[in-house]
């Protein structure tokens, strides 16, 4: 009888030690208060962004800013490709606000739209989608998110002019990503059709940046995904007329 009791106690102790070990491991891997608290701001399925300190920092800053006194801003909305550019300097327009966040997705943009539309901006230029594909989302899912983004803007800020910029190509030879040229071109086709249906301005940047193999031209990038200075100058030349109008 004592032997059975001893075995039972031993097994229970081992079980508790295993559970404790797993909890310690989880805490070391980032299961902390910041991650839990962030769920009130960011959709939990944003795997790339929830664990990204840069994302959390920029997101919290945007939510902390008071409404600027200057109305009718021009907003650039997107991921790191948008964030990396000093748009107000590039386009010589101090009325431009950069709301790009590294690692963001179309779902992430949907979650933070309230922080955008409350500004009642004059124009919004949107580009996103590459990070969605990295999360395994389909072209259909990304298109659907775009549609919801545009309709949300129109519902909450009806005077805002929306500009959808085509998704730029990437260069798999440099970045080794699994995203294919076909995913990008299929998304761009969907966005162009949607823009025509909804009366949204569609800016087709893709042909200017793509090479003969369907990849981002090497002269416009260092890592195969993000643009360098020459790339942003080319982008500027394609959109500056929409800024002036």
Give the role of each language-model region.
Residues 41-148, 176, 182:
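Conserved SGNH/GDSL esterase-like catalytic core that processes O-acyl groups on lipids
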Residues 105, 132-134, 168-171, 209:
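Feature marks short, surface-exposed loop/turn motifs that line or immediately flank catalytic pockets
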Residues 27, 169-245:
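Catalytic His-Asp segment of secreted/periplasmic serine-dependent ester chemistry enzymes
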């Amino acid at each position: 009888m004592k032997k059975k009791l001893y075995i039972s106690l031993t097994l229970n102790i081992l079980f508790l030690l295993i559970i404790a070990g797993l909890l310690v491991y989880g805490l070391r891997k980032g299961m902390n208060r910041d991650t839990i608290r962030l769920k009130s701001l960011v959709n939990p399925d944003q795997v790339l962004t929830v664990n990204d300190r840069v994302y959390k920092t920029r997101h919290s800053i945007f939510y902390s800013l008071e409404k600027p006194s200057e109305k009718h801003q021009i907003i650039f909305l997107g991921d790191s490709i948008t964030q990396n550019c000093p748009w107000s300097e590039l386009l010589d327009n101090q009325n431009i606000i950069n709301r790009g966040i590294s690692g963001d997705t179309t779902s992430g943009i949907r979650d933070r739209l309230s922080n955008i539309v409350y500004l009642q901006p004059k124009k919004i230029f949107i580009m996103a989608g590459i990070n969605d594909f990295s999360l395994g989302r389909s072209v259909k899912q990304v298109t659907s998110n775009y549609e919801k983004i545009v309709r949300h803007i129109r519902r909450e800020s009806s005077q805002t002019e929306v500009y959808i910029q085509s998704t730029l190509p990437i260069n798999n030879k440099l970045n080794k990503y699994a995203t294919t040229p076909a995913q990008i071109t299929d998304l761009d086709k969907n966005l162009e059709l949607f823009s025509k249906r909804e009366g949204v301005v569609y800016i087709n940047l893709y042909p200017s940046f793509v090479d003969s193999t369907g990849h981002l031209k090497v002269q416009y990038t260092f890592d195969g995904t993000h643009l360098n200075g020459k790339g942003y100058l080319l982008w500027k030349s394609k959109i500056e007329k929409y800024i002036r109008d």
